[in-house]
Amino acid sequence: MSIAREFVGLPSPKLARAGAGGHPCQGLYWTKEGTRPRVALIATHYNVDFAEHYSAPYFAARGFGFLGWNTRYRGAEDLFHLEHAIADIGVGVRWLREQGVQTVVLLGNSGGGSLMAAYQAEAADKGDLYISLNAHPGRPEVLTKWMDPSVIDETDPVATDAALDPFNAASGPPFSNEFIARYRAAQVARNLRITRWAQDELKRLNAARIPDRIFPLFRTWADLRFIDPAIEPTERPCPGCYAGAPNFANRGPFGIGRTSSLRAWLSMWSLETSRCQGPPQLAKLDVPALVVQSTADMGVFPSDARKIHDSIASTDKTLTFLAGAHYFEDSEAHREAAIDLMADWIRERT
């Protein structure tokens, strides 16, 4: 059995093809050789390239089309604006319809879960089914839960409040309930402080006819669940995070939101102003929805999956837990089981 991959490059209603030739909207369409599927999935992320999404050949082998789709913000989350991303996703959905696809399944994987939910809530050409696969509830929520609240100077990666330092042995693990509550409140406070600064800085720059600027964000691998396995116990390796050992990752240059424009912060990361938060958008979803969560995920937790499931307005919604890691990369059997589960769910509704 041969799997075909077709490159798709298209302009967006809000952005034409670049002078060098690249299209703002790009991806790969995966199908079983010689077929024209009537049911297809589309998967998009805020900034990660999903053209070669791990699940694409598995779904294609089962007779579905799969469009791994990228917006203009692939690799450029520091410039993200939700309205433009929604327009770019719509280009992919319309292309699928033009190929004869009758049922479009929005696959929201990892950070893409809230993005696809926002698309479904706000776009004109909506999907017919929605799947949340090991998805974070929303972009502001995941950043806030991961950020290190012991940062006391956003311009200095070293400056630390020792009383809130999660890697200070005096704090834990194990972490006390009092420390956890104080820590979580301080994480929210950090997000709000950055939002206030971003709003004020944008006004200051605009007054000088400067439209925006980039700023760094330090230390975003500090969710206490990365360090203490007793907090929301699962089968995940702990201590650990997607970037390795949390104490080293948290001091390194790689992390979500590591650079951002002021407008991108307000559009994507802010707890106060972003429409990339899950619950408000999920509350507008009335199509059949499936929430799949793996039990050894190091960055998405059972409470996240339950929050997503509970927020979806549809009366046809299912929450399922499966063995495996975030991308089911730990086991071929886990990956096959996850794809079979989703494929069966789709077939039952098409």
Identify the residue ranges that each predicted region occupies.
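Conserved alpha/beta-hydrolase
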Residues: A56-A76
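Catalytic histidine-centered segment of alpha/beta-hydrolase-like enzymes
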Residues: G324-A337
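Short alpha-helix in the alpha/beta-hydrolase fold that links the catalytic acid
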Residues: A56, K145-D148, V287, F301-D310
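Short beta-strand/loop motif that positions the catalytic acidic residue
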Residues: L285, V291-Q293, D297
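Alpha/beta-hydrolase active-site loop
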Residues: L79-Q99, A118
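N-terminal cap/lid segment of alpha/beta-hydrolase-fold proteins
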Residues: M1-V39, S331
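Alpha/beta-hydrolase-fold enzymes
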Residues: K126-C241
